[in-house]
Amino acid sequence: MSNITIRNFGAIKKHSDPIEIKKVTFFIGNQGSGKSTVAKLIATFMWIEKALFKESYNPQWFEKNNTFRDLFLSYHRLENYLKEDTYIQYTGSAFSITYTKGQLSFEKKEMAYALPQLMYVPSERNFISYMKSMRELKVASAALNDFLAAYTYAKEKVTEIPLPINESYLLYDKNRDILYVKGDDYRVQLSEASSGFQSLVPLFLVSDYLVNSVKNKTEPMSIEERKRFEKQIKEIYANPHFTEEQRRSAANALSEKFNKTSFVNIVEEPEQNLFPTSQRNMLYSLLKINNEIPANKLIITTHSPYLVNYISVAVEAGNIQNKANKEQIRKIIPISALVKSDDLAIYQLNEKEGSVELLDNYGGIPSDENFLNNEIGRTNELFADLLDLQ
């Protein structure tokens, strides 16, 4: 299992235990506590591991002075979060990567590795719903640009697909390059739809497109990747020392370095602008996508107590699915959205302490004693205090 340890980076001051990156991982906490920072670092180190596995770059290139800061951290605008005593260690299936004293170092691992399709879904995604290109934005992060590229590919595949909220559908008019949201008695352009749709549609559309591209192996190689793949294939078949069986084996091993076999979906605040029941349906749609391939991972940063409570429902349903009638469970939650208790980790971040702590669980169910639920309880206390003044 992958994990990451972070010390003295941005808002994160201390974290003694590695953060385990499970099939479903949540980060909750106040604004400025470092939720997105942790998620972005996970995305960054997973990308480096993937590049090393594919031999897109050699380790010496990554070890050059300031490459990590100026190229990789700047992608997510994290370059100024580095400190003199920053320590980060990421352990994946293919490589262990350590940043300390201003340098990256690598250790190759001999474990099965599912080459991932990585996607970071930024919180600014709702801009995309009413802008056709990043040229229309004066300032855009590299992450948002890449998300827009995936969104552009994804919408080209759409004719009409169901959305997970409001019993609605998404339609695409290719001639006019316009997306529409359609219900029983309405059809509106996405650019004129509610803010909830403008936030949800890019997230759902790209997630659905990418998981299907991995399942169906339709995600194209880049021009550079294809050139490198073809060159190495030619070298394999031109090698006079290989038998035919060895050539086939080497070609299959090479293909594994280029064919993606998992989808890692890293989503900032998926609850944006959504009513609680829509948050639930949105979450269940992401869990369904996550469950479509065994090696998939879903990483979420959130302020929403509803999402934490709904994921608890998914875990409890997963715990009892062998003991209860599936039809009865299906009336409560889609079977496709169930989560095994061992596949979930929820971390709380404390901006005052700069800490990251794993949320306790009871019988695999996340504890109710978390920052988000505690704030709901606090409103009851405040109301009771006011009643005492009457």
What are these language model-derived features?
Residues N265, N296-Y306:
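Conserved H-loop
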Residues N281-L286:
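Conserved hydrophobic alpha-helix in the ABC-type ATPase nucleotide-binding domain
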Residues M1-K174, A253-L254, E292-A295, V308-N309, ...:
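P-loop NTPase switch/coupling surface
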Residues F275-P276:
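Conserved D-loop-proximal element of ABC-family nucleotide-binding domains
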Residues E268-P270:
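Walker B catalytic acidic pair
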Residues T91-T98, V121-K260:
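Extended helical coiled-coil dimerization/tether regions that scaffold
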